[in-house]
């Protein structure tokens, strides 16, 4: 259900701007997307887990705010990121 350390390092390496970049908005957004995808898979077999569903909604909101920030500052980076992550545009 949670993201493994190896997978997190993979995501950091893939989305990082520089070599030691672990906190840029693109990296944070990629990690949040991975956590959201894991929780979505969890709900396919545990549909009554309402506590985790609230956590999922919090993660989705956090990712939305990060994507809004990226979109406001660099539209081309935003479009590239959402295509790599496979998510829809924010209205």
UniProtKB/Swiss-Prot annotation:
GO BP terms: translation
Stated role: One of the primary rRNA binding proteins, it binds directly to 16S rRNA where it helps nucleate assembly of the platform of the 30S subunit by binding and bridging several RNA helices of the 16S rRNA. Forms an intersubunit bridge (bridge B4) with the 23S rRNA of the 50S subunit in the ribosome.
Annotated InterPro entries: Ribosomal_uS15, Ribosomal_uS15_bac-type, uS15_NS1_RNA-bd_sf
Assembly and interaction partners: Part of the 30S ribosomal subunit. Forms a bridge to the 50S subunit in the 70S ribosome, contacting the 23S rRNA.
Pfam families: Ribosomal_S15 (PF00312)
Alphabetically ordered keywords of this record: Ribonucleoprotein, Ribosomal protein, RNA-binding, rRNA-binding
One GO MF term attached to the UniProt entry: structural constituent of ribosome
Similarity comment text for this entry: Belongs to the universal ribosomal protein uS15 family.
NCBIfam families: S15_bact
Superkingdom to which the source organism belongs: Bacteria
Keyword Ribonucleoprotein: yes
CDD domains linked: Ribosomal_S15p_S13e
Listed name of the protein: Small ribosomal subunit protein uS15
One Gene Ontology cellular component: cytosolic small ribosomal subunit
């Amino acid at each position: 259900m949670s993201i493994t350390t190896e997978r997190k390092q993979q995501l950091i390496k893939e989305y990082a701007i520089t070599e030691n970049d672990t906190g840029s908005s693109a990296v944070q957004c990629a990690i949040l997307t991975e956590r959201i995808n894991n929780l979505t898979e969890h709900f396919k077999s545990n549909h009554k887990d309402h506590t985790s569903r609230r956590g999922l909604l919090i993660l989705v909101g956090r990712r939305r705010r990060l994507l809004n920030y990226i979109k406001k500052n660099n539209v081309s980076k935003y479009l590239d990121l959402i295509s790599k992550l496979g998510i829809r545009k924010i209205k």
